[in-house]
From Swiss-Prot:
Protein's job: Plays an important role in the functional organization of mitotic chromosomes. Exhibits low basal ATPase activity, and unable to polymerize. Proposed core component of the chromatin remodeling INO80 complex which is involved in transcriptional regulation, DNA replication and probably DNA repair. Required for the recruitment of INO80 (and probably the INO80 complex) to sites of DNA damage Strongly prefer nucleosomes and H3-H4 tetramers over H2A-H2B dimers, suggesting it may act as a nucleosome recognition module within the complex.
Phosphoserine modified-residue sites: S132, S412
CDD domains registered for this protein in UniProt: ASKHA_NBD_Arp8-like
Spans annotated as Disordered: 1-29, 430-460
Protein name: Actin-related protein 8
InterPro entries on file: Actin, ATPase_NBD
A GO molecular-function descriptor: ATP binding
SUPFAM superfamilies: Actin-like ATPase domain
Record-linked Gene3D superfamilies: 2.30.36.90, 3.30.420.40, Actin, Chain A, domain 4
Alphabetical GO biological process terms: cell division; chromatin remodeling; DNA recombination; DNA repair; positive regulation of DNA repair; positive regulation of DNA-templated transcription; positive regulation of telomere maintenance in response to DNA damage; regulation of cell cycle
Location of the protein in the cell: Nucleus; Chromosome
Sequence positions that bind ATP: S55, T56, D283, V284, G285, D286
UniProt main location, coarse: nucleus
């Protein structure tokens, strides 16, 4: 037999063997993809949109983008009828500023700030010489603006074609005389539900849908009809409202038309974006500051707290301090959008946390409002530039009275669509389990409550017990759970815990105390040690010169002595990998899109349509 004949015979045998395997049901080997795996992953990531919605700024982009598009998270809606009263959501102004006690609280807070400034020595070993506002006021009151140009170069948004809505920068630059309402759909990290026009849940969701759809079309150049080919990664706050998250997911999948979604927490995404596995995340935003401890991709529930102040409060405080020093731009109004933009710019330009910068300094700034001449102002400032950012550590300086300033992680209100929510599980527990829980409640209530103290030691265990056991029980539910005196005792214990929580949440914790409290709520000393060794600051609210050294000094001085002895270094990171701290969380969302484990987290449109909120309980990477 020739070589050619032998080859033909072998080929024939191979083909026969393949046919035999097919008949037996043996799977054929998968044909290797024509596109290399790395390129496939890139193509897949290019069809994932990462959305990080903030109170003031929306960050949105493809997972493959180096940087996201950042636009003001605001919408202007045209009036349906002429003559309607204008409605504008406030930016720098907020509830609780004009109470009778506000000014006294502001002054007391400023005294604490001044005491802290004086007590810390400069790097040369001497103490700072305080500068009173009177020293700058006499000079500033004489200052008059110089006209740089009769045209500022900025213009109001053209509304001659009567658009139904305007988004982002265009909404900010709508002429106040035009018939448009201004809405910021997210306030202090939550949906901006309020009793005024456009304040219902439906209206807020409609505003968000319009803003996000506009951004996707304009900045990502994706036609809305093509969103069925795209998937979305949505970043949510660590302390989230389940109802709001459910509605946002429904909007993204069913109304905007994305094919799938992954929902994840900002803090965990910040660790992905920074490349750190375990760290205490301090997210200082424009309107809220959130603190929590993240370990190996898990945000510890008991360590989460949200403070109802941020960068915009520092801007408003800086304006108040400049007014005391005779701020020469006397027409400045906190109700004017252009003036709010100016004050934000002045804060970012002049404020710092450097103890070595002291005495009076000369500064200048320009005002370029639309349809107005360009003006140049010169003025002097002293300690005001340091006092304003220090208000983050002494929030009484903000002068906010009668508002809930600290939020802990609470048990949710329950969802009728979710058959496994906590309320349902509690209602179906056996009598034995309920009795055991009641006994545990009484024991925990008998222990002293330490919220009034320094928020350390035994007191830190209380929020953990509260979160684990806090239930909203009516009298009828209480009677069902246990009989007679047991029911009364349990309700008394519950009320005492709720009183402790309300007292704690009424206080405005300083940033350093909030960090210490969060770390102190960790379950083990090893975890606490990890968190003290790595504190990551993200967001744009603490982007001041020398903020890293300042925060590090505050934490070192206030941390428990037992940890001070064993921790070699408290590492405060404000710019991981030299990245903009405002973009870290978004970048982490983009990293999440590329992880292999993320494949298990996707919730697809058909699944959501069929199972609804149950998919979040099944697929979310955190405890829903």
């Amino acid at each position: 037999m020739t070589q050619a004949e032998k080859g033909d015979a072998e080929n024939g045998k191979e083909k026969g063997g393949e046919k035999e395997k097919e008949q037996r049901g043996v799977k054929r080997p998968i044909v290797p993809a024509l596109v290399p795996e790395s390129l496939q992953e890139q193509i897949q990531s290019n069809f994932i949109v990462v959305i990080h919605p903030g109170s003031t700024t929306l960050r949105i982009g493809r997972a493959t983008d180096t940087l996201p598009a950042s636009i003001p998270h605001v919408i202007a809606r045209r009036h349906k009828q002429q003559g309607q009263p204008l409605y504008k959501d406030n930016w720098l102004l907020r509830e609780g500023l004009n109470k009778p006690e506000s000014n006294e609280q502001r002054q007391n807070g400023l005294k604490m700030v001044d005491q802290a400034i004086w007590s810390k020595k400069m790097s040369n070993g001497t103490r700072r010489i305080p500068v009173s506002p009177e020293q700058a006021r006499s000079y500033n009151k004489q200052m008059r603006p110089a006209i740089l140009d009769h045209c500022s170069g900025n213009k109001w948004t053209n509304t001659s074609h009567h658009p139904e809505f305007l988004v982002g920068e265009e909404a900010l630059y709508v002429n106040p005389l035009d018939c448009y309402n201004i809405h910021w759909p997210i306030r202090r990290g939550q949906l901006n539900i309020h009793p005024g026009p456009g304040g219902s849940l439906t209206a807020v969701l409609a505003d968000i849908e319009v803003i996000w759809s506009h951004a996707i079309q304009k900045y990502l150049e994706i036609p809305l009809k093509d969103l069925k080919y795209y998937r979305c990664i949505l970043l949510i706050p660590d302390i989230y409202n389940k109802q709001h998250v459910k509605e946002l997911v429904n909007m993204i999948l069913m109304k905007m038309g994305f094919s799938g979604i992954v929902v994840h927490q900002e803090s965990v995404c910040a660790t992905f974006g920074s490349g750190l596995s375990s760290t205490c995340i301090v997210d200082v935003g424009d309107q809220k500051t959130s603190v929590c401890c993240v370990e190996d991709g898990v945000s510890h529930r008991n360590t989460r707290l949200c403070l109802a102040y941020g960068g915009s409060d520092v801007s408003r405080c800086f304006y108040w301090l400049m007014q005391r020093a005779g701020f020469p731009y006397r027409e400045c109004q906190l109700t004017n959008k252009m003036d709010c933009l100016l004050l934000q710019h002045l804060k970012e330009t002049f404020c710092h946390l450097d103890q070595d910068i002291s005495g009076l300094q000369d500064h200048e700034f320009q005002i370029r409002h639309p349809d107005s001449p360009a003006l140049l102002y010169q003025f002097r400032l002293g300690d005001e530039k340091l006092q304003a950012p220090m208000a983050l550590f002494y929030p009484a300086t903000f002068g906010i009275v009668g508002q809930k300033m600290t939020t802990l992680q609470h048990r949710s209100q329950g969802d009728p669509e979710d058959p496994h929510d906590e309320h349902y599980l509690l209602a179906t527990q056996s009598k034995q389990e309920q009795s055991a829980k009641a006994t545990a409640d009484r024991k925990s209530a008998s222990k002293p409550i330490g919220f009034e103290g320094d928020l350390r030691g035994q007191s830190s265990d209380l929020p953990e017990r509260l979160h684990a056991q806090e239930v909203d029980l009516g009298s009828s539910q209480g009677d069902c759970l246990m009989a007679g005196n047991e029911s009364e005792e349990a309700l008394t214990a519950l009320m005492s815990r709720k009183t402790a929580i309300s007292l704690f949440e009424g206080k405005a914790l300083g940033l350093d105390k909030a960090i210490l409290h969060s770390i102190d709520c960790c379950s083990s000393d090893d975890t606490k040690k990890k968190m003290y060794s790595s504190i990551l600051v993200v967001g744009g609210g603490l982007m001041f010169h020398k903020a890293q050294e300042f925060l590090q000094h505050r934490i070192l001085n206030k941390m428990p002595p037992s940890f001070r002895r064993i921790i070699e270094n408290v590492d405060v990171i404000t710019r991981p990998k030299d990245m903009d701290p405002r973009l870290i969380a978004w970048k982490g969302g983009a990293v999440l899109a590329c992880l292999d484990t993320t494949q298990e987290l996707w919730i697809y449109q058909r699944e959501w349509q069929r199972f609804g909120v149950r998919m979040l309980r099944e697929r979310a990477a955190f405890v829903w």
